[in-house]
Structures are given as structure tokens and as C-alpha cells.
């Protein structure tokens, strides 16, 4: 298993209190595949450098995951299907 850092930018129209519960269904995929969620860091609403889908702000979330690469690819695919997700970025952490 490898360490990954995933940054997610969520549509600012979503209430910040509902961000963690809405991400739980994606994090459950990691847990079911014998991975672990090391940290969930919700930065809150921030201004974007450039507009994404005509939005100037987004809710930033940073996840630290320990899982297989196929699991990360599946989560990224599912997040990109979701209309509330503006952008995702996955980085493999150095050991």
C-alpha cells in the first residue's frame, strides 16, 4: 500500500457542515479495500485562483490516504462524476 494525498475542491453552494458526511461514502471505499484514511482536513471556503465552472470560490478538503493505486483511481473517478466536485488532484507521497 502507498501513501496518497488528495485535494478536493467542492462547490461553495454546499453547506460546509455537510462536507464531511458527503465524503464518507467515498472514504468507505478506502476502508472496504483494507486501506486507511490517515487525515481529513477541511480548509473551508477559499477563493480560487481562476474560475472553475463559473465559480470564484470553493470548499477545499485535503485527504491523506493509505491504500492501493486502484482504490485511489476508483475514488477519483467517482468524485469526477459528482456534480458538486469542482476539481480533484491526487499526489503520491514520498516514503
Curated annotation (Swiss-Prot):
Q: Which UniProt keywords apply?
A: Ribonucleoprotein, Ribosomal protein, RNA-binding, rRNA-binding
- GO MF annotation: an example: small ribosomal subunit rRNA binding
Q: Which Gene3D superfamilies does this entry report, sorted A to Z?
A: 3.30.70.60
Q: Which CDD domains match?
A: bS6
InterPro entries assigned: Ribosomal_bS6 (IPR000529), Ribosomal_bS6_sf (IPR035980), Ribosomal_S6_plastid/chlpt (IPR020814), Transl_elong_EF1B/ribsomal_bS6 (IPR014717)
Q: Which cysteine-cysteine pairs are annotated as disulfide bonds in the entry?
A: none
As for what it does, the entry says:
Binds together with bS18 to 16S ribosomal RNA.
* Name of the protein in its database record: Small ribosomal subunit protein bS6
Amino acid at each position: 500500500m502507498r501513501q496518497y494525498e488528495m485535494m478536493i475542491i467542492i462547490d461553495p453552494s454546499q453547506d460546509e457542515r455537510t462536507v464531511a458526511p458527503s465524503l464518507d461514502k467515498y472514504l468507505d471505499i478506502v476502508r472496504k479495500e483494507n486501506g486507511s484514511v490517515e487525515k481529513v482536513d477541511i480548509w473551508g471556503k477559499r477563493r480560487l485562483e481562476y474560475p472553475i465552472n463559473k465559480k470564484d470560490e470553493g470548499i477545499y478538503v485535503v485527504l491523506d490516504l493509505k491504500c492501493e493505486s486502484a482504490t485511489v483511481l476508483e475514488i477519483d473517478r467517482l468524485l469526477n462524476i459528482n456534480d458538486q466536485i469542482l476539481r480533484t488532484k491526487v499526489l503520491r507521497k514520498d516514503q
